[in-house]
Amino acid sequence: MRHTLPLAPQFYVTAPQPCPYIDGRMERKLFTALQGEFAETLNDSLSKQGFRRSQNVLYRPSCADCTACLSARIDVSAFTPSRSQRRTLKRNAVMEREATSPWATEDQYSLFRKYLDARHAEGGMADMDIFEFAAMIEETPVRSRVVEYRQSAEAAPNRKRAPRNLAGVCLTDVLDDGLSMVYSFYDPDLVRQSLGTFMVLDHVEIAREAGLPYVYLGYWVPGSPKMGYKASFSGLEIYKNGEWQPIGDPESHSRDTHPLNVDPIAEQVAKINLPDTLPTDRRKG
């Protein structure tokens, strides 16, 4: 099914499929292609409205009877690490960061497979081969970086580990107002390092150094064990009812179904604000 606006681009909706976050529910996504010379402008604009990027597609949950998935971002100016997060930073003080072009490597894929097998063996990415992994990393029409984290030789907890062994990876988009952590994975053997939390903390620092106000974390789902850690970051905002707002008490947000609060697809599309820099002929399309 296709839904169009008087302004380009065009938006589509996926067929319902089982929700990966809440058992017994069905998910549906609203999406549009991300391509051409205005891809970055569109990515910047729609990211502010709760969309996420996957390769050359921007998508947002548009479920028929559920509004549980909420886009989340950290307001860098309002962030202060907790005691637990300060300990995580201290434990990873010798971790070395390197930002590279979005180019997939065998080391990355090996770590990716190890991470999936340990943490998400039944997930939608479980069967991803190296070519699909390369597409996930490399097929980006916007400004993206691969941020790698490696342990220094002195920090390796096991003498048998190779120096500077790859410990974590994050595919990151650079937006006009922040960093978007598109996908991250890490060595599941390094449990004590809390690498998932550390990479978020490090991206907050990168954003602060770059003068960018936000770090986009993807979706937060109330009560979801997979998503609960995101609510532990101070300065967290969620995109709800068409605007960004402080998360407040995480327990106050319900994941009950709300069929009467879900606008029809055509109305959802009509409410999307498109960037003003699209060329006139496309906007009239």
Curated annotation (Swiss-Prot):
GO molecular function term, any single one: leucyl-tRNA--protein transferase activity
Keywords assigned by UniProt, alphabetized: Acyltransferase, Cytoplasm, Transferase
Coiled coil, from the record: none
Gene Ontology annotations for the cellular component aspect, listed alphabetically: cytoplasm
Pfam families: ATE_C (PF04377), ATE_N (PF04376)
Gene Ontology process terms (BP): ubiquitin-dependent protein catabolic process via the N-end rule pathway
Enzyme class: transferase
Transferase among keywords: yes
Keyword Cell cycle: no
Family per record: Belongs to the R-transferase family. Bpt subfamily.
Function: Functions in the N-end rule pathway of protein degradation where it conjugates Leu from its aminoacyl-tRNA to the N-termini of proteins containing an N-terminal aspartate or glutamate.
Matches recorded under HAMAP family: Bpt (MF_00689)
Protein name per the record: Aspartate/glutamate leucyltransferase
Species: Dinoroseobacter shibae (strain DSM 16493 / NCIMB 14021 / DFL 12)
